[in-house]
Amino acid sequence: MREPEEDEEEKSGDQAPRILGPDFLDHTACLPPNMHNDWISVLAAENNRRISDANEWNHVFHTPRSAEYIFTACTRLRLPQEVKYSALLIFDNFMVQLVSRLHESIYNSRRSDRKKYQEWNRIEATLSRQVTLRMLSAIQIASKMHSYHDSLSIQTVKLCLKTLGFAYTEESVVRSELRVLSMINWEPAYHSTPLVYIESLFKILKMKWEHVEVCNYWRYILLVLDCVFIHWNDVYKRMMANVLGPSADVVTREQMCRVQADWFLLACGVIVTASCCIDGMRTADEITNELHRLSNIPLADITDMSVAIIECIINQQGPIANISSIQI
């Protein structure tokens, strides 16, 4: 027989809110320090593959509006932070593949130019109506990648669409998910999201910098990363302008996409920006040096990335920017 007190304790434990983010103070199952370099090497190898695979069509549908929509949906659905970044990348990849194939099909058809134009207008209208469904499918897939047990169910996606004014059936939700997966060749994304790179570097930093306020830093890191994802093109254009000056205008889209594919650079820039906001430039410089040692990203590149992020954030605040939060 179980004691009543034990049952009550178990019930209260089940009702406790689950921690969806990383716990940097919990060292259970952590890699020992002598394996940190091995894990960084794994991330570096994946990072190099992603840079090599980058092309001019990456991030075409990664716009401020699509990022804000997906981020808002994930927030209201109370999904883990990592899901929204994966969902946005999946959605962008799917839309690029879908639109390019549809365009190729129309272009190679034997219709007259007028018929092709009419058919393409019809396709654009259909794609526009289905954008919300495709975004929810991308979120559903991303939630399964993070934790299948806690992923969005078909019923939840259907209810969410109904709340937004779309009367899709459960069968339509399933077909959409399969459509997204098949279009991206059943490869949702690289194994690690940008947040994994940030979390890994920050975890190693935390072991050396014990005085760092983990919760405060992580909150700022997530805010900064959200800003970067929402204002993606603006941040990288500013960074290239900082690096190349007037010559930045001749940078091709493919070259820009290769820079955007470097998630170690992104991770370092985000962490340094967060440290600059919290502890000022002196601490940010020290963290920059440590991140350079861990990631092999040049010091100047990390600085240029963080400066571009700060410039973008200040610019988004309007002409009367409140920069008091950034300690010089």
Regions found by a protein language model. Give the residues of each.
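Acidic, serine/threonine-rich low-complexity regulatory regions at protein termini
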Residues: 1-328
